[in-house]
Amino acid sequence: MCEPAPPKPTQSAWHSFPECPALLLLLSLLLLPLGLPVLGAPPRLICDSRVLERYILEAREAENVTMGCAQGCSFSENITVPDTKVNFYTWKRMDVGQQALEVWQGLALLSEAILRGQALLANASQPSETPQLHVDKAVSSLRSLTSLLRALGAQKEAMSLPEEASPAPLRTFTVDTLCKLFRIYSNFLRGKLTLYTGEACRRGDR
């Protein structure tokens, strides 16, 4: 007598992910730095406070580690970074598109700065392994943050400014050490990025 054919595998295990928010969040955080999409991941993943907190903690850890770095943490040239100071009165009076543009441009410039720092460290005469690891992690994190902001609609809002609106040029300055670069990175995440995402997420919940 022929035995019955085994049942076909189902997708129930995979479809159970949306029923486990904590597991889905963990999977999203693991795959985001690799640039891999996560089936069922919420489009506004950055609205989960734990996500942004993770990147802020990484940035502050990198700043603390490089604070005592005496060798191999100075750059052979100055690197341009965004100004992270926030005038809260001015910020609240800014149009949503202007806020998005300032954050989007700042994140792009910060990404360029970290990449430039990565290249300078790699070409240093005596490269230090620990700072290099933190720079590599920052490069990956900034790519993930860019994807998260794009999913939140920041790029679309930044490009939706009317032609008659002339936003002020992005304020910048330069840094010459890895510690200063990571300090800017940390301040940007805790300041303008947190302010923008907080308001954008609240608007989406209305």
UniProtKB/Swiss-Prot annotation:
It is found in: Secreted. Glycans are attached at residues 64, 78, 123. Produced by kidney or liver of adult mammals and by liver of fetal or neonatal mammals. Disulfide bonds join 47-201, 69-73. It comes from the Eukaryota. Residues 1-40 form the signal peptide. The keyword Cell membrane does not apply. One of its GO terms (molecular function) is hormone activity. Belongs to the EPO/TPO family. Hormone involved in the regulation of erythrocyte proliferation and differentiation and the maintenance of a physiological level of circulating erythrocyte mass. Binds to EPOR leading to EPOR dimerization and JAK2 activation thereby activating specific downstream effectors, including STAT1 and STAT3. This is Erythropoietin. The gene is EPO.
